[in-house]
Amino acid sequence: MNIIIVGCGKVGCTLVEALSIENHNIVVIDSRPEKVSALTDTVDVMGIVGNGVSHTTLKQAGIETADLLIAVTGSDEENLLCCVIAKKSGHCQTIARIRNPIYNEEKDFLQKEFGLSMIINPELTAANEISKVFQFPSAIRVDTFAKGRVELLHFKIGNNSPLCGLKLSKFHATLHCNDILVCTIARNSEEVIIPNGDFEFAANDIVSIVAKRKDAIDFFRKIGLEKNRVSNTIIAGGGKISYYLAKSLLMSGIKTTIIEINQQRCEFLSEQLPKATILCGDATDKELLSEECIEKAAGFAALTDLDEENILLSLYANGISSAKTVTKVNRINFTSVINKLDLGSIIYPRVITAEYIIKYVRSMNNSLNSNVEALYKLEDGKAEVLEFLLKENSAVCNIPLQDLKIRKNTLICCIYRNHQVIVPSGQDCMMAGDSVMIATSGYNISDIKEILED
């Protein structure tokens, strides 16, 4: 696929790195020569120094034959205009990054009137991910499928967990949890395992399971990870993510306090979020945190602009309270180190944004067999969990799973059919109209038939 990416900032770079691995022809555009050079020197892409709004620049980038243009500059207006000019200059689909809360309220209008294929708001997307883990604090990450009806829950095994040393073959009999399916195991931040019956759980493994919510709650109780729903939250930092998160939490009835050092920003937040408590102060001030009873907080989100501050704040919160903690990290260079720290749920906004866009790119390859409906990457892309909507002519339909020759390191995690969640056995079949969750490790797929051996 021919893809043009306008903007070589954090999100742009993450997109280029992820999409180039999937063998797309990519052209990047940015007005900053050093940003273009940094990408073209490390990734096999073509770079153009110029203004992405310019018709001449877009023509030079090959807009007439492009399949997709993604505008992720720092300016919402530039992104919108870039997409409009791209639509007029060629026949490509367009994606625009829009961050301003005012534009976000008019997203449907903008998408329709400007003919945009997709609008992505990184801060809102990150806030939604954080809100999900506050709703289910036993998990460190919650991914949703089938339009929110199926959940993939990730949790960390503690040193004293009953799972330690347990073989997967004895998992259901020991814990009496037949409706729980173990999908993937991330170990030492170095590998992601699609487990078989001989697999043995160990402390510090990150386990992902598919389950109905009530079954998951019962399972977490059995392994000692049961936590009550968060009732109050302290948010360090008053940026866009904090704004969207507070709005979501307040709508869910969760008391929310935001600590922000900038007076002008505090005034804005007070006007926009009248039900929240807004404090003007330094979130790293231990006395201020103590005054706000951080020791008794049910939830704590470190969302300042500095990774170092966020990491220290979450470590401090975990040390003095039992709060559900969430840590925002912008840089992704040291994920293997950061993931080993006791930071609760770690949110990488640019990675989340890239995942949403990659899902859309894969869905553009919709085939006779299936559509890609959702996609989540695990451990820096070492594994993926995808949702496919099966079509009538799919090569995998109406065949018992035990009779399908499924590739190594591939697992059919769940089938969603007629409002029912099916944890599949060998006798089950996939059928047209099903939403099917697939976990894979070691390769990328964009069509359900690719789970089969050649």
Which residues fall in each region the model found?
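Cytosolic regulatory regions of ion transport systems
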Residues: 1-454
